[in-house]
Amino acid sequence: MGICISKPPTLDMHYRANNEHSENETASSSPSHSPTQEIDPYASSFSQLPPRASSKVRALADALRLANNINPELAHYAQRVLATVANSQPTREISNLDAKNLATLVRTYNAKYPGLNLQYARTPGEFRNALADSDEASWRSIAILHSQGSHRVAIDVRTHDDGHKSLLVMETAAAFKRDENDEALLQFGYSEFIEDLKYEFGSNASIAVIDVGAQKSHIGCQPFCFDFALNAFHKSDLFDDLHQRLHDHGQCSTRRDEAEFIDGTEYISGAKILPAVFYKHAESRATIDTVLREQPAIASKDVSTHRGGPAETLQERVRAFRIQRDEITYSMSIEASRIRKIREAIENDHG
C-alpha cells in the first residue's frame, strides 16, 4: 500500500496547460526556408533591444547564417526566436520550440561540461524510471512536473554510498502561495509528483524543493531550468552539502526561517540560501531586491559567466537587460540566455 499524504489545495496556474499542446503544436513544425530568409527582415529591429541583448541576438544571427549542415529543427528554432525577440516577449510557440529542441541543447551542454550528466524527462514517470535505473553519484534532470501540464522543474540528484537517492527540486516560479486563511496552496503538480515518488521509492529517496522564484512571466520555465541545472553543477560544493543534510537529517535548512514544511516536504526559500548566479536572469527588479535583503553579502558578487569579461553584479545585470514591452518593464536576461544556448548548439552540436 502506498504512503498516504494529505493534499493541500493546489495553486491552479498557467502550468495546467496540456502537455501535448505544449510540445506538438503545428506552429513548431520545421519549415523548408533557408536560414537567411527569416533573419534578414528582423535585423533592423535588433537595435531597439538593450545593447547587450542586441549583441547576443546578432551573434546568433551570424552563427545561423554561417552554419553548414545545420539541424533543420534547430535552425527553425533559432529563426523563430530571432523573429520574436525583436518585437515581443516569448510566445507559446517559443515555449513549444524550447521543448522540441531540449534534447539537442542537453546533448550540446553534456559535451561541453563533462560530469554535468544532464537528462530530461517528458513525464514524471519517465523521471522516476531514470531515478530507479541510475547509479550515477551525481546527475541532473529537466522534468515535467505533471503529466497533464507543461511546467518543468530542474532536479539535482545524488546517489549516496548506501544507495539512498536525494533530490533537490528547483522551482523557477513559486511552488506554493498562501491564501487569505494562511493555508498553503501548492502549485499544480507538486502533490502528485511527491506522492508518486514516495509511493515508488519509500524511504529509499528523499526530496526537498527550493523555491527560486526568478521567473515571473507565464511562459519560459525551460530556460530557467536549464540555467538552474548548470548552476547546481557549477556550485556542486553547496549542493553536495545540501544533499548530505537531506540524507542525514531529512532536511536541508539549518535555520527555522529558511524553509517551510508542507505535508512533510521541505520547501526552501532560494532567496535565503542560493548563490547570486541563480538570480542572474531574474525578470523582476523586486526579486533582486528581495534576494539582496535576505543576503546583503552577495550584492557585490560577480554573476558574469563570460570568461575574461568584466565583472557584473545582480543589480548591474538587471539594468543592462532592462526593456519595456506592452507597458511592462522587466529584465530580458533569460531571453538572452536562451539565445546564447541556441548559438552554442548551432556552433558545436554535431548530432
What name fits each language-model region?
Residues 2-154, 167:
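Cysteine protease catalytic domains with a Cys-His-Asp triad
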Residues 133-237:
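Cysteine protease-like catalytic core of ubiquitin/ubiquitin-like
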Residues 114, 123, 163, 182, ...:
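Intrinsic-disorder/low-complexity loop/linker signature
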Residues 101-104, 126, 189-192, 241, ...:
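Exposed alpha-helical structural elements
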Residues 46-53, 67-75, 95-99, 120, ...:
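Intrinsic-disorder-associated interaction segments
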Residues 237-351:
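Contiguous terminal or domain-adjacent regions
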